[in-house]
Amino acid sequence: MAKKRVVVLYGGRADEHSISCISTAGVLGAMDTERFEPIPVGITKDGKWIINGEDPRGWNLDGGELPTVKITPESRPVMLDPSRGQDGFFIGEPSHINSADSGFGTSFVSMSDPEMHHVLTSLGHVDAVLPVLHGPYGEDGTVQGLLEMMGVPYVGCGVFASAACMDKHYTKVVLDAAGIPTAPGVTVDARNFTAADVLAEIEDAGLTYPLFVKPSRAGSSFGVTKVEKADDRETQQDRLAAAIATAGEHDWKVLVEQGIDGREIECAVLCPKAGDEPEASWPGEIVLDHQNDDQFYDFDSKYMDASASHVEVPANLPVSVLEDVRDVARRAFKAVDGVGLSRVDTFVTPDGTVMVNEINTMPGFTPISMYPKAWDATGVSYTELITRLIEGVLR
């Protein structure tokens, strides 16, 4: 049987660019190459699609340096002709990548132009796309919309679920409407606010400290600040203003959420084929072995300091509570019309209440990430997980 050809998209324009690269290294290393022919296509930080660049299989964080998609002498641009669907992927010459007057300033071409046949080579038929892209311009419905328009099967949530879950404000709107508890909070426009007005809104909402201030549309703990209670209003306003400014560097829409007294428990959800009932893994917990001064699980703790934490699956909770987390995760996934995969992050309070923190439609996918580790502990190996996700979208 012929191998199915799978374009693996990685990198991208988001802050999470390097995390996407690391996830892709794991995915390519675990993919069943007896069934699939992976075709890695990198996206540079400025949005150029390239092939034949640096091999992502060798990337890791052992050296402490974050990998990025770079244009090398061997790199060639990838162009798309949306009208040709699964046969609409083409490769240009290296000189086309940065040539301003070559006509290749965009990734879109029309092969109805006879001239294009002299300068572009077909990538061949693509059976599916696996977008291992985190954050905006990849996990937010934009790439999903492009692939929908082309009629190319792809792994993961569709346009609506991707967009709704990328924007934490609208995740709350959807989940609240579905009767699923979320952390109390307010939304602030970082382009136009006064700290006094924000503080008044926080007080009107009855939020208690500490507060977590975060970008609405960012991940991997970028731009997140923990704000403690101050002794006076002026200091409190200064702290809030600084935290909103930090979050505003990543997104003008900023959430100010009440810190929840509870444990952060994560659950992996799998639904390879649209319309099937979603499955939920045993929930897991990231246990902090030591913390930085901010006392929360920040970017460095997640990715740069291997000694900062370890993953426990299943989490050390009563089975009844674990089952409640699984149930809430499935309900949340269905509420946003999820398909493919998601990691549902929850808080479990001391009285056993399960609240959804956020839904990641393309969670970290490295071998040590929670999503594959949770499924491995539930009986689905890393390789089997990737196989099921791809085969679920094949025609």
From Swiss-Prot:
<comment type="similarity">
    <text>Belongs to the D-alanine--D-alanine ligase family.</text>
</comment>
<dbReference type="InterPro" id="IPR013815">
    <property type="entry name" value="ATP_grasp_subdomain_1"/>
</dbReference>
<keyword id="KW-0436">Ligase</keyword>
<keyword id="KW-0460">Magnesium</keyword>
<feature type="binding site">
    <location>
        <position position="345"/>
    </location>
    <ligand>
        <name>Mg(2+) 1</name>
    </ligand>
</feature>
<dbReference type="Pfam" id="PF01820">
    <property type="entry name" value="Dala_Dala_lig_N"/>
</dbReference>
<dbReference type="GO" id="GO:0046872">
    <property type="term" value="F:metal ion binding"/>
</dbReference>
<keyword id="KW-0067">ATP-binding</keyword>
<dbReference type="GO" id="GO:0005829">
    <property type="term" value="C:cytosol"/>
</dbReference>
<dbReference type="InterPro" id="IPR011761">
    <property type="entry name" value="ATP-grasp"/>
</dbReference>
<dbReference type="Pfam" id="PF07478">
    <property type="entry name" value="Dala_Dala_lig_C"/>
</dbReference>
<feature type="binding site">
    <location>
        <position position="358"/>
    </location>
    <ligand>
        <name>Mg(2+) 2</name>
    </ligand>
</feature>
<dbReference type="GO" id="GO:0009252">
    <property type="term" value="P:peptidoglycan biosynthetic process"/>
</dbReference>
<dbReference type="InterPro" id="IPR016185">
    <property type="entry name" value="PreATP-grasp_dom_sf"/>
</dbReference>
<comment type="pathway">
    <text>Cell wall biogenesis; peptidoglycan biosynthesis.</text>
</comment>
<dbReference type="GO" id="GO:0008716">
    <property type="term" value="F:D-alanine-D-alanine ligase activity"/>
</dbReference>
<keyword id="KW-0963">Cytoplasm</keyword>
<keyword id="KW-0133">Cell shape</keyword>
<feature type="binding site">
    <location>
        <begin position="204"/>
        <end position="266"/>
    </location>
    <ligand>
        <name>ATP</name>
    </ligand>
</feature>
<dbReference type="InterPro" id="IPR005905">
    <property type="entry name" value="D_ala_D_ala"/>
</dbReference>
<dbReference type="InterPro" id="IPR011095">
    <property type="entry name" value="Dala_Dala_lig_C"/>
</dbReference>
<keyword id="KW-0479">Metal-binding</keyword>
<feature type="binding site">
    <location>
        <position position="360"/>
    </location>
    <ligand>
        <name>Mg(2+) 2</name>
    </ligand>
</feature>
<keyword id="KW-0573">Peptidoglycan synthesis</keyword>
<protein>
    <recommendedName>
        <fullName>D-alanine--D-alanine ligase</fullName>
        <ecNumber>6.3.2.4</ecNumber>
    </recommendedName>
</protein>
<keyword id="KW-0547">Nucleotide-binding</keyword>
<dbReference type="GO" id="GO:0071555">
    <property type="term" value="P:cell wall organization"/>
</dbReference>
<dbReference type="InterPro" id="IPR000291">
    <property type="entry name" value="D-Ala_lig_Van_CS"/>
</dbReference>
<dbReference type="GO" id="GO:0008360">
    <property type="term" value="P:regulation of cell shape"/>
</dbReference>
<feature type="binding site">
    <location>
        <position position="358"/>
    </location>
    <ligand>
        <name>Mg(2+) 1</name>
    </ligand>
</feature>
<dbReference type="InterPro" id="IPR011127">
    <property type="entry name" value="Dala_Dala_lig_N"/>
</dbReference>
<keyword id="KW-0961">Cell wall biogenesis/degradation</keyword>
<comment type="function">
    <text>Cell wall formation.</text>
</comment>
<feature type="domain" description="ATP-grasp">
    <location>
        <begin position="172"/>
        <end position="391"/>
    </location>
</feature>
<keyword id="KW-0464">Manganese</keyword>
<dbReference type="GO" id="GO:0005524">
    <property type="term" value="F:ATP binding"/>
</dbReference>
